[in-house]
Protein backbone atom coordinates (compact mmCIF):
# COMPACT_ATOMS: atom_id res chain seq x y z
CA UNK A 1 0.00 0.00 0.00
CA UNK A 2 2.86 2.37 0.87
CA UNK A 3 4.40 1.84 -2.56
CA UNK A 4 1.04 2.52 -4.23
CA UNK A 5 0.64 5.79 -2.32
CA UNK A 6 4.19 6.84 -3.17
CA UNK A 7 3.52 6.00 -6.83
CA UNK A 8 0.42 8.20 -6.85
CA UNK A 9 2.29 11.08 -5.19
CA UNK A 10 5.17 10.73 -7.63
CA UNK A 11 2.73 10.69 -10.53
CA UNK A 12 1.04 13.86 -9.34
CA UNK A 13 4.40 15.62 -8.94
CA UNK A 14 5.79 14.56 -12.30
CA UNK A 15 2.64 14.47 -14.42
CA UNK A 16 3.14 10.77 -15.16
CA UNK A 17 -0.17 8.92 -15.58
CA UNK A 18 0.18 6.67 -12.54
CA UNK A 19 -3.45 6.81 -11.46
CA UNK A 20 -4.90 5.54 -14.77
CA UNK A 21 -2.36 2.70 -14.74
CA UNK A 22 -3.37 1.70 -11.23
CA UNK A 23 -7.01 1.81 -12.24
CA UNK A 24 -6.41 -0.55 -15.15
CA UNK A 25 -4.57 -3.02 -12.93
CA UNK A 26 -7.01 -3.08 -10.02
CA UNK A 27 -10.45 -3.50 -11.63
CA UNK A 28 -11.88 -6.97 -12.27
CA UNK A 29 -14.02 -7.94 -15.22
CA UNK A 30 -16.89 -8.68 -12.87
CA UNK A 31 -16.74 -5.16 -11.46
CA UNK A 32 -16.54 -3.69 -14.95
CA UNK A 33 -19.58 -5.66 -16.07
CA UNK A 34 -21.55 -4.41 -13.07
CA UNK A 35 -20.78 -0.83 -14.11
CA UNK A 36 -21.91 -1.53 -17.68
CA UNK A 37 -25.15 -3.23 -16.61
CA UNK A 38 -25.98 -0.54 -14.08
CA UNK A 39 -25.45 2.19 -16.67
CA UNK A 40 -27.32 0.30 -19.39
CA UNK A 41 -30.37 -0.15 -17.18
CA UNK A 42 -30.30 3.45 -16.02
CA UNK A 43 -30.35 4.61 -19.63
CA UNK A 44 -32.88 2.15 -21.03
CA UNK A 45 -35.40 1.91 -18.22
CA UNK A 46 -37.42 5.12 -18.82
CA UNK A 47 -37.94 4.16 -22.47
CA UNK A 48 -38.77 0.49 -22.00
CA UNK A 49 -40.82 0.81 -18.82
CA UNK A 50 -43.00 3.57 -20.21
CA UNK A 51 -43.47 1.83 -23.57
CA UNK A 52 -44.54 -1.35 -21.79
CA UNK A 53 -47.00 0.67 -19.69
CA UNK A 54 -48.30 2.60 -22.72
CA UNK A 55 -47.14 5.88 -21.18
CA UNK A 56 -44.19 6.70 -23.45
CA UNK A 57 -45.87 9.54 -25.33
CA UNK A 58 -47.31 10.88 -22.09
CA UNK A 59 -44.10 10.82 -20.06
CA UNK A 60 -41.18 11.23 -22.48
CA UNK A 61 -39.93 14.82 -22.56
CA UNK A 62 -39.08 16.61 -25.78
CA UNK A 63 -35.89 18.61 -26.06
CA UNK A 64 -34.47 19.83 -29.37
CA UNK A 65 -33.24 22.89 -31.23
CA UNK A 66 -36.07 22.15 -33.70
CA UNK A 67 -39.67 22.38 -32.48
CA UNK A 68 -41.30 20.15 -35.09
CA UNK A 69 -39.86 16.65 -34.62
CA UNK A 70 -41.61 15.44 -31.48
CA UNK A 71 -43.94 12.95 -33.18
CA UNK A 72 -40.93 11.10 -34.55
CA UNK A 73 -38.89 11.27 -31.34
CA UNK A 74 -40.66 8.30 -29.72
CA UNK A 75 -39.62 5.78 -32.37
CA UNK A 76 -36.12 7.24 -32.21
CA UNK A 77 -35.89 6.44 -28.51
CA UNK A 78 -37.44 2.99 -28.93
CA UNK A 79 -35.48 1.83 -31.97
CA UNK A 80 -32.13 2.99 -30.66
CA UNK A 81 -32.66 1.64 -27.16
CA UNK A 82 -33.63 -1.80 -28.45
CA UNK A 83 -30.75 -1.81 -30.94
CA UNK A 84 -28.31 -1.34 -28.08
CA UNK A 85 -29.83 -3.52 -25.37
CA UNK A 86 -30.76 -6.46 -27.62
CA UNK A 87 -27.49 -8.45 -27.43
CA UNK A 88 -27.63 -8.39 -23.64
CA UNK A 89 -31.27 -9.51 -23.64
CA UNK A 90 -30.44 -12.32 -26.06
CA UNK A 91 -28.43 -14.04 -23.32
CA UNK A 92 -31.79 -14.85 -21.72
CA UNK A 93 -32.68 -15.25 -18.09
CA UNK A 94 -30.84 -17.27 -15.47
CA UNK A 95 -30.71 -17.50 -11.67
CA UNK A 96 -28.11 -14.77 -11.20
CA UNK A 97 -29.16 -11.22 -10.24
CA UNK A 98 -28.14 -10.09 -13.72
CA UNK A 99 -30.11 -12.92 -15.29
CA UNK A 100 -33.21 -11.91 -13.36
CA UNK A 101 -32.68 -8.33 -14.46
CA UNK A 102 -32.53 -9.53 -18.07
CA UNK A 103 -35.78 -11.41 -17.53
CA UNK A 104 -37.45 -8.19 -16.42
CA UNK A 105 -36.25 -6.23 -19.43
CA UNK A 106 -37.01 -8.99 -21.92
CA UNK A 107 -40.60 -8.92 -20.71
CA UNK A 108 -40.78 -5.11 -20.79
CA UNK A 109 -39.25 -4.94 -24.26
CA UNK A 110 -41.50 -7.61 -25.77
CA UNK A 111 -44.57 -5.93 -24.29
CA UNK A 112 -43.32 -2.55 -25.44
CA UNK A 113 -42.73 -3.65 -29.03
CA UNK A 114 -46.23 -5.10 -29.10
CA UNK A 115 -47.62 -1.74 -27.99
CA UNK A 116 -45.49 0.21 -30.46
CA UNK A 117 -47.01 -1.62 -33.44
CA UNK A 118 -50.57 -1.86 -32.11
CA UNK A 119 -52.81 0.75 -33.80
CA UNK A 120 -55.10 0.68 -30.76
CA UNK A 121 -52.33 1.56 -28.30
CA UNK A 122 -51.74 5.15 -27.17
CA UNK A 123 -48.07 4.42 -27.85
CA UNK A 124 -48.57 3.28 -31.45
CA UNK A 125 -45.57 4.66 -33.33
CA UNK A 126 -45.15 6.19 -36.78
CA UNK A 127 -43.23 4.05 -39.29
CA UNK A 128 -44.45 5.22 -42.68
CA UNK A 129 -44.21 9.02 -42.88
CA UNK A 130 -41.18 10.61 -44.54
CA UNK A 131 -38.49 10.69 -43.60
CA UNK A 132 -37.13 10.12 -40.08
CA UNK A 133 -39.08 6.90 -39.33
CA UNK A 134 -36.95 4.97 -41.82
CA UNK A 135 -33.92 5.62 -39.63
CA UNK A 136 -35.45 4.25 -36.48
CA UNK A 137 -37.38 1.43 -38.11
CA UNK A 138 -33.88 0.40 -39.15
CA UNK A 139 -32.47 0.54 -35.63
CA UNK A 140 -35.44 -1.46 -34.38
CA UNK A 141 -34.92 -4.00 -37.17
CA UNK A 142 -31.25 -4.32 -36.24
CA UNK A 143 -32.22 -4.85 -32.61
CA UNK A 144 -34.59 -7.65 -33.57
CA UNK A 145 -31.83 -9.28 -35.62
CA UNK A 146 -29.59 -9.10 -32.56
CA UNK A 147 -32.12 -10.83 -30.31
CA UNK A 148 -34.03 -13.29 -32.51
CA UNK A 149 -34.83 -15.66 -29.64
CA UNK A 150 -35.62 -13.35 -26.76
CA UNK A 151 -37.35 -10.53 -28.65
CA UNK A 152 -38.70 -11.80 -31.97
CA UNK A 153 -39.17 -15.28 -30.55
CA UNK A 154 -41.24 -14.05 -27.61
CA UNK A 155 -43.57 -11.81 -29.62
CA UNK A 156 -47.05 -13.20 -30.20
CA UNK A 157 -47.93 -14.21 -33.78
CA UNK A 158 -50.19 -11.16 -34.02
CA UNK A 159 -47.43 -8.83 -32.83
CA UNK A 160 -44.93 -10.37 -35.27
CA UNK A 161 -47.36 -9.83 -38.12
CA UNK A 162 -47.85 -6.21 -37.11
CA UNK A 163 -44.08 -5.63 -36.80
CA UNK A 164 -43.70 -6.86 -40.37
CA UNK A 165 -46.52 -4.55 -41.48
CA UNK A 166 -44.90 -1.54 -39.82
CA UNK A 167 -41.43 -2.28 -41.17
CA UNK A 168 -42.91 -2.52 -44.66
CA UNK A 169 -44.55 0.88 -44.20
CA UNK A 170 -41.07 2.40 -44.20
CA UNK A 171 -40.67 1.37 -47.85
CA UNK A 172 -42.51 4.52 -48.92
CA UNK A 173 -39.49 6.51 -47.70
CA UNK A 174 -36.73 7.06 -50.24
CA UNK A 175 -33.37 7.10 -48.45
CA UNK A 176 -30.79 9.80 -49.05
CA UNK A 177 -27.60 8.91 -50.91
CA UNK A 178 -25.66 8.51 -47.69
CA UNK A 179 -25.59 6.19 -44.69
CA UNK A 180 -29.38 6.28 -45.02
CA UNK A 181 -29.16 3.64 -47.76
CA UNK A 182 -28.22 1.12 -45.10
CA UNK A 183 -31.38 1.90 -43.16
CA UNK A 184 -33.38 0.56 -46.08
CA UNK A 185 -31.00 -2.39 -46.38
CA UNK A 186 -31.25 -3.45 -42.73
CA UNK A 187 -35.05 -3.25 -42.77
CA UNK A 188 -35.09 -5.58 -45.76
CA UNK A 189 -32.53 -7.86 -44.11
CA UNK A 190 -34.82 -8.20 -41.09
CA UNK A 191 -37.79 -8.94 -43.33
CA UNK A 192 -35.74 -11.58 -45.14
CA UNK A 193 -34.70 -13.15 -41.84
CA UNK A 194 -38.16 -13.20 -40.29
CA UNK A 195 -40.43 -13.73 -43.31
CA UNK A 196 -38.21 -15.30 -45.96
CA UNK A 197 -38.74 -12.52 -48.48
CA UNK A 198 -37.67 -8.93 -49.02
CA UNK A 199 -37.28 -6.16 -51.58
CA UNK A 200 -33.89 -7.12 -52.97
CA UNK A 201 -33.47 -3.78 -54.71
CA UNK A 202 -33.63 -1.89 -51.40
CA UNK A 203 -31.49 -4.57 -49.76
CA UNK A 204 -28.69 -4.54 -52.31
CA UNK A 205 -28.53 -0.91 -53.38
CA UNK A 206 -26.82 0.36 -50.24
CA UNK A 207 -24.46 -2.61 -50.04
CA UNK A 208 -23.28 -2.01 -53.59
CA UNK A 209 -22.81 1.73 -53.07
CA UNK A 210 -20.57 1.25 -50.07
CA UNK A 211 -18.73 -1.71 -51.57
CA UNK A 212 -18.12 -0.33 -55.05
CA UNK A 213 -18.12 3.47 -54.80
CA UNK A 214 -17.78 4.87 -51.30
CA UNK A 215 -14.85 3.00 -49.74
CA UNK A 216 -12.01 5.46 -49.13
CA UNK A 217 -9.37 3.09 -47.76
CA UNK A 218 -8.05 1.87 -44.40
CA UNK A 219 -11.52 0.84 -43.17
CA UNK A 220 -13.03 4.28 -43.81
CA UNK A 221 -16.20 4.71 -45.85
CA UNK A 222 -17.55 7.98 -47.15
CA UNK A 223 -20.95 9.00 -45.87
CA UNK A 224 -22.03 9.12 -49.48
CA UNK A 225 -19.57 10.15 -52.16
CA UNK A 226 -17.63 12.46 -49.84
CA UNK A 227 -15.64 11.63 -46.74
CA UNK A 228 -16.56 13.40 -43.49
CA UNK A 229 -14.40 13.26 -40.38
CA UNK A 230 -17.04 12.13 -37.91
CA UNK A 231 -18.16 8.89 -36.29
CA UNK A 232 -20.81 7.77 -38.79
CA UNK A 233 -18.63 4.82 -39.76
CA UNK A 234 -19.37 3.65 -36.21
CA UNK A 235 -22.86 5.03 -35.58
CA UNK A 236 -24.27 3.36 -38.70
CA UNK A 237 -22.07 2.25 -41.56
CA UNK A 238 -19.87 -0.58 -40.28
CA UNK A 239 -22.44 -2.13 -37.91
CA UNK A 240 -25.36 -2.08 -40.34
CA UNK A 241 -23.34 -3.12 -43.38
CA UNK A 242 -21.96 -6.06 -41.43
CA UNK A 243 -25.34 -7.14 -40.08
CA UNK A 244 -26.96 -6.90 -43.52
CA UNK A 245 -24.24 -9.07 -45.03
CA UNK A 246 -24.55 -11.66 -42.25
CA UNK A 247 -28.21 -12.12 -43.16
CA UNK A 248 -27.40 -12.24 -46.86
CA UNK A 249 -24.79 -14.93 -46.30
CA UNK A 250 -27.09 -16.95 -44.03
CA UNK A 251 -29.73 -17.00 -46.76
CA UNK A 252 -27.16 -17.65 -49.51
CA UNK A 253 -28.06 -14.48 -51.34
CA UNK A 254 -25.96 -13.18 -54.25
CA UNK A 255 -23.02 -10.90 -53.38
CA UNK A 256 -22.89 -11.99 -49.74
CA UNK A 257 -19.25 -13.03 -50.23
CA UNK A 258 -18.37 -9.39 -49.54
CA UNK A 259 -18.93 -10.20 -45.86
CA UNK A 260 -15.39 -11.57 -45.53
CA UNK A 261 -13.89 -8.28 -46.70
CA UNK A 262 -16.26 -6.23 -44.58
CA UNK A 263 -15.42 -8.17 -41.43
CA UNK A 264 -11.73 -7.33 -41.90
CA UNK A 265 -12.61 -3.69 -42.42
CA UNK A 266 -14.76 -3.69 -39.29
CA UNK A 267 -11.88 -5.16 -37.30
CA UNK A 268 -9.49 -2.51 -38.55
CA UNK A 269 -11.94 0.30 -37.83
CA UNK A 270 -12.48 -1.13 -34.34
CA UNK A 271 -8.72 -1.03 -33.84
CA UNK A 272 -8.73 2.66 -34.79
CA UNK A 273 -11.55 3.40 -32.35
CA UNK A 274 -9.68 1.65 -29.55
CA UNK A 275 -6.70 3.89 -30.27
CA UNK A 276 -8.94 6.95 -29.96
CA UNK A 277 -9.43 6.26 -26.23
CA UNK A 278 -7.05 8.50 -24.29
CA UNK A 279 -5.16 7.36 -21.18
CA UNK A 280 -7.81 9.12 -19.11
CA UNK A 281 -10.73 7.44 -20.89
CA UNK A 282 -11.81 10.27 -23.16
CA UNK A 283 -11.98 10.50 -26.95
CA UNK A 284 -11.89 13.24 -29.63
CA UNK A 285 -14.97 15.46 -29.73
CA UNK A 286 -15.27 15.80 -33.48
CA UNK A 287 -17.93 15.59 -36.17
CA UNK A 288 -21.68 15.82 -36.21
CA UNK A 289 -23.99 13.94 -33.85
CA UNK A 290 -21.33 13.87 -31.14
CA UNK A 291 -24.14 13.99 -28.55
CA UNK A 292 -24.74 10.30 -29.31
CA UNK A 293 -22.11 9.86 -26.61
CA UNK A 294 -20.97 6.23 -26.30
CA UNK A 295 -22.65 5.43 -29.62
CA UNK A 296 -19.25 6.51 -30.95
CA UNK A 297 -18.09 3.01 -30.01
CA UNK A 298 -20.91 1.08 -31.70
CA UNK A 299 -18.50 -0.50 -34.19
CA UNK A 300 -15.86 -1.29 -31.55
CA UNK A 301 -18.46 -2.99 -29.39
CA UNK A 302 -19.82 -4.92 -32.35
CA UNK A 303 -16.36 -6.16 -33.30
CA UNK A 304 -15.91 -7.37 -29.72
CA UNK A 305 -19.35 -8.99 -29.68
CA UNK A 306 -18.69 -10.85 -32.93
CA UNK A 307 -15.11 -11.78 -31.94
CA UNK A 308 -13.74 -9.77 -34.85
CA UNK A 309 -11.15 -7.72 -32.98
CA UNK A 310 -7.71 -7.85 -34.63
CA UNK A 311 -5.24 -10.27 -33.09
CA UNK A 312 -3.12 -7.47 -31.66
CA UNK A 313 -6.08 -6.11 -29.65
CA UNK A 314 -6.69 -8.00 -26.41
CA UNK A 315 -10.43 -7.99 -25.63
CA UNK A 316 -9.75 -7.01 -22.02
CA UNK A 317 -8.05 -3.79 -23.10
CA UNK A 318 -11.21 -2.83 -24.97
CA UNK A 319 -13.25 -3.63 -21.87
CA UNK A 320 -11.05 -1.53 -19.63
CA UNK A 321 -10.84 1.43 -21.99
CA UNK A 322 -14.57 1.46 -22.67
CA UNK A 323 -15.37 1.11 -18.98
CA UNK A 324 -13.38 4.24 -18.26
CA UNK A 325 -15.17 6.07 -21.09
CA UNK A 326 -18.58 4.98 -19.75
CA UNK A 327 -17.69 6.20 -16.27
CA UNK A 328 -16.50 9.55 -17.60
CA UNK A 329 -19.39 10.02 -20.00
CA UNK A 330 -22.20 9.40 -17.52
CA UNK A 331 -20.63 10.49 -14.23
CA UNK A 332 -22.39 13.86 -14.16
CA UNK A 333 -25.98 13.95 -12.93
CA UNK A 334 -26.50 16.69 -15.53
CA UNK A 335 -26.78 13.95 -18.18
CA UNK A 336 -30.30 13.19 -16.88
CA UNK A 337 -33.42 15.08 -15.94
CA UNK A 338 -35.16 14.58 -12.61
CA UNK A 339 -37.11 11.58 -13.95
CA UNK A 340 -34.09 9.83 -15.42
CA UNK A 341 -34.51 10.80 -19.08
CA UNK A 342 -31.38 11.64 -21.04
CA UNK A 343 -30.63 15.29 -21.66
CA UNK A 344 -29.05 16.34 -24.94
CA UNK A 345 -25.34 16.72 -24.42
CA UNK A 346 -21.97 15.00 -24.36
CA UNK A 347 -21.02 14.70 -20.71
CA UNK A 348 -23.88 16.73 -19.30
CA UNK A 349 -26.67 19.08 -20.39
CA UNK A 350 -25.14 20.66 -23.53
CA UNK A 351 -27.83 21.18 -26.16
CA UNK A 352 -25.73 23.65 -28.18
CA UNK A 353 -23.43 20.75 -29.10
CA UNK A 354 -26.31 19.22 -31.07
CA UNK A 355 -27.74 19.67 -34.54
CA UNK A 356 -31.32 20.60 -35.35
CA UNK A 357 -32.22 16.99 -36.21
CA UNK A 358 -31.27 15.85 -32.71
CA UNK A 359 -33.93 15.45 -30.03
CA UNK A 360 -34.37 13.57 -26.78
CA UNK A 361 -35.08 10.30 -28.59
CA UNK A 362 -32.00 10.60 -30.77
CA UNK A 363 -29.65 10.54 -27.80
CA UNK A 364 -30.51 6.93 -26.97
CA UNK A 365 -28.11 5.83 -29.69
CA UNK A 366 -25.59 5.91 -26.84
CA UNK A 367 -26.87 2.44 -25.92
CA UNK A 368 -25.22 0.94 -29.00
CA UNK A 369 -21.94 1.39 -27.15
CA UNK A 370 -22.95 -1.45 -24.79
CA UNK A 371 -23.05 -4.36 -27.28
CA UNK A 372 -20.32 -6.41 -25.53
CA UNK A 373 -22.80 -7.11 -22.74
CA UNK A 374 -24.15 -9.66 -25.20
CA UNK A 375 -21.06 -11.74 -24.42
CA UNK A 376 -21.54 -14.05 -21.42
CA UNK A 377 -19.67 -13.27 -18.23
CA UNK A 378 -17.22 -16.12 -18.85
CA UNK A 379 -16.16 -14.79 -22.25
CA UNK A 380 -12.54 -13.56 -22.23
CA UNK A 381 -13.80 -10.03 -22.85
CA UNK A 382 -15.16 -10.09 -19.29
CA UNK A 383 -13.20 -12.86 -17.56
CA UNK A 384 -9.64 -11.97 -18.54
CA UNK A 385 -7.49 -9.94 -16.15
CA UNK A 386 -7.44 -6.16 -16.64
CA UNK A 387 -5.34 -4.93 -19.56
CA UNK A 388 -4.17 -1.45 -20.44
CA UNK A 389 -5.56 0.03 -23.63
CA UNK A 390 -3.23 1.34 -26.34
CA UNK A 391 -2.95 4.99 -25.34
CA UNK A 392 -2.61 4.15 -21.66
CA UNK A 393 0.35 1.91 -22.47
CA UNK A 394 1.93 4.30 -24.95
CA UNK A 395 1.78 7.33 -22.66
CA UNK A 396 3.17 5.24 -19.80
CA UNK A 397 6.32 4.45 -21.78
CA UNK A 398 5.37 0.86 -22.53
CA UNK A 399 5.78 -0.95 -25.82
CA UNK A 400 2.84 -0.77 -28.22
CA UNK A 401 2.60 -2.59 -31.57
CA UNK A 402 3.16 -0.41 -34.62
CA UNK A 403 -0.06 0.67 -36.30
CA UNK A 404 -0.49 -0.50 -39.89
CA UNK A 405 -3.16 0.43 -42.42
CA UNK A 406 -5.39 -2.24 -43.88
Regions found by a protein language model. Give the residues of each.
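Bacterial Sec-dependent N-terminal signal peptides
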Residues: 1-27
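Low-complexity, Ser/Thr/Pro/Gly-enriched N-terminal "stalk/linker" regions
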Residues: 25-77, 83, 87, 107-114
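Aromatic-lined, polymer-binding surfaces characteristic
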Residues: 74, 85-88, 102-263, 275-301, ...
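Long, charge-dense tracts
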Residues: 97-98
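Non-catalytic carbohydrate-binding regions of carbohydrate-active enzymes
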Residues: 257-355, 381-397
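Beta-sandwich/jelly-roll carbohydrate-recognition scaffolds of carbohydrate-active enzymes
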Residues: 83, 87-93, 404
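CBM-like carbohydrate-recognition segments
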Residues: 49-66, 117-122, 325-406
Amino acid sequence: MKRIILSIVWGLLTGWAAVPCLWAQSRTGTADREIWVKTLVRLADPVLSNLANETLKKEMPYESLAPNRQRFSYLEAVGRTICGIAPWLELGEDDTPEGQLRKKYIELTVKGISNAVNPSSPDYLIFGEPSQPLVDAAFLAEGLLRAPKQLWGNLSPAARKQVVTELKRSRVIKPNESNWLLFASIVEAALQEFTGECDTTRLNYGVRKFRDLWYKGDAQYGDGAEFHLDYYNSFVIHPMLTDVLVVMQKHRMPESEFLNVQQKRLGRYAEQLERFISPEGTYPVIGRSIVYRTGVFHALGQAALLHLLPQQIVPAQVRCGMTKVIENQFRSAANFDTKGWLKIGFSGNQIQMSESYINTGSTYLCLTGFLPLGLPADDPFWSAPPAEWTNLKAWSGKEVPADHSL
